[in-house]
């Protein structure tokens, strides 16, 4: 029989545990000697490396559709923190370094999230759609992935979009991050936009970047 977590036995301890994990999570980054990307530039860099899109509303989850609209709200808050961000030589992009205070002015809503193997509506749920898109963008650059995590299991069918369904990069504040380091001489930049149906993302650079010879084309390649 699988041993239960302490927070499963005593749910009232969960908020305290989450605060503890987040504190240690960011404390570790403060002293890890990485130079994290925080600079934005209003204008776009001249060289487009790759662009893609992700369908916002998934009607096939089997759960209340309101969670999909809540997810879109959450995505827009998180995207604001990293839109037009520069990833300069020697810098490391961290999803949570940027999105840490995304809900400071406007609160997240409950979105779907995989928790202990079960789909639940949780505060800020749905941000993995953004981390998936980011990971797919990064896969088309020479940026070095230094932290990446897959979901423990896939939860529901994913509709066709510009991001292949096998692309998987989960994030969870205090536990799991998505990080890439720029070990090149080029500066990269992220750009995002929304329309009614899609989240669009692209990555640009300040100079031409050679296309990667070995591109991932299936779930067994990272």
State the predicted function of each range:
Residues 2-222:
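Well-ordered beta-sheet/strand-loop patches within structured domains
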């Amino acid at each position: 029989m699988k041993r239960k977590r302490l927070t499963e036995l005593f749910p009232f301890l969960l908020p305290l545990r989450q605060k503890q994990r987040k504190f240690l999570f960011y404390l570790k980054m403060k002293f890890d000697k990485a130079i994290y990307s925080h600079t934005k530039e209003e204008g776009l860099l001249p060289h487009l490396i790759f662009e893609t899109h992700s369908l916002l509303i998934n009607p096939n989850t089997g759960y209340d559709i309101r969670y999909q609209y809540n997810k879109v709200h959450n995505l827009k808050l998180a995207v604001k923190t990293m839109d037009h961000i520069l990833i300069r030589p020697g810098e490391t992009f961290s999803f949570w370094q940027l999105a840490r205070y995304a809900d400071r002015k406007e609160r997240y809503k409950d979105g779907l999230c995989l928790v202990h193997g079960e789909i639940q509506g949780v505060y800020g749920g749905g941000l993995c759609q953004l981390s998936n898109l980011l990971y797919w963008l990064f896969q088309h650059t020479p940026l070095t992935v230094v932290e990446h995590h897959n979901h423990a299991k896939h939860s529901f069918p994913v509709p066709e979009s510009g991001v292949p369904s096998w692309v998987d990069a989960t994030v969870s504040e205090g536990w799991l991050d998505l990080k890439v380091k720029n070990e090149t001489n080029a500066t990269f930049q992220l750009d995002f936009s929304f329309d009614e149906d899609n989240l669009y993302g692209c990555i640009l650079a300040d100079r031409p970047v050679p296309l990667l010879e070995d591109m991932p084309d299936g779930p067994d390649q990272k």
